[in-house]
């Protein structure tokens, strides 16, 4: 994912947390805030409690890959931050994708293209 699609500055993170709305499931929390740009931007947060640097970076790479694959179905004009919760480090890629897309659907950031995919429900 290109750098202009990422939230990088602390000021931007703070604004999203303070002024944005949050949505969550058991594995992820998503904060979102509308922006005036013509594209979405995403920030990632993975706590040190989830594991060592290798584990945290693997989680971030997987999240970026899932978002890259869903890029065409994500709404524009929104900044959002994905926070990984405890337990996400034990998930495989498919289960992580299912959980992340579920919380993005809750927040209405992700909209299914032609409706060919079945609805997924996560505990």
UniProtKB/Swiss-Prot annotation:
Gene Ontology biological process terms, A to Z: tRNA 5'-leader removal
Any GO MF annotation of the entry: ribonuclease P activity
Protein's UniProt keywords contain Zinc: no
Disulfide bonding pattern of the chain: none
Keyword field: Endonuclease, Hydrolase, Nuclease, RNA-binding, tRNA processing
Reaction(s) catalysed by this chain's protein: Endonucleolytic cleavage of RNA, removing 5'-extranucleotides from tRNA precursor
Pfam family, one: Ribonuclease_P
EC number per UniProt: 3.1.26.5
Broadest EC class assigned to this enzyme: hydrolase
Any GO CC annotation of this UniProt entry: ribonuclease P complex
Superkingdom: Bacteria
Subunit structure: Consists of a catalytic RNA component (M1 or rnpB) and a protein subunit.
Function, as annotated: RNaseP catalyzes the removal of the 5'-leader sequence from pre-tRNA to produce the mature 5'-terminus. It can also cleave other RNA substrates such as 4.5S RNA. The protein component plays an auxiliary but essential role in vivo by binding to the 5'-leader sequence and broadening the substrate specificity of the ribozyme.
Family of the protein in this entry: Belongs to the RnpA family.
Entries under PANTHER family matching the protein: RIBONUCLEASE P PROTEIN COMPONENT
UniProt protein name: Ribonuclease P protein component
Protein's organism: Streptococcus pneumoniae serotype 4 (strain ATCC BAA-334 / TIGR4)
Upper lineage: Bacteria, Bacillati, Bacillota, Bacilli, Lactobacillales
Gene, per the UniProt record: rnpA
């Amino acid at each position: 994912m290109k750098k202009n699609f990422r939230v990088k500055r602390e000021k931007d993170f703070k604004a999203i947390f303070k002024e944005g709305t949050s949505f969550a499931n058991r594995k992820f929390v998503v904060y979102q805030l509308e922006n005036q740009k013509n594209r979405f931007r995403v920030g990632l947060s993975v706590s040190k409690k989830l594991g060592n640097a290798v584990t945290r970076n693997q989680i971030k790479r997987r999240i970026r890959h899932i978002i890259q694959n869903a890029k065409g179905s994500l709404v524009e004009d929104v900044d959002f931050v994905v926070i990984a919760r405890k337990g996400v480090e034990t998930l495989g890629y498919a289960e992580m994708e299912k959980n992340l897309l579920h919380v993005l659907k809750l927040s209405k950031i992700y909209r299914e293209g032609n409706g060919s995919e079945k609805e997924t429900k996560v505990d």
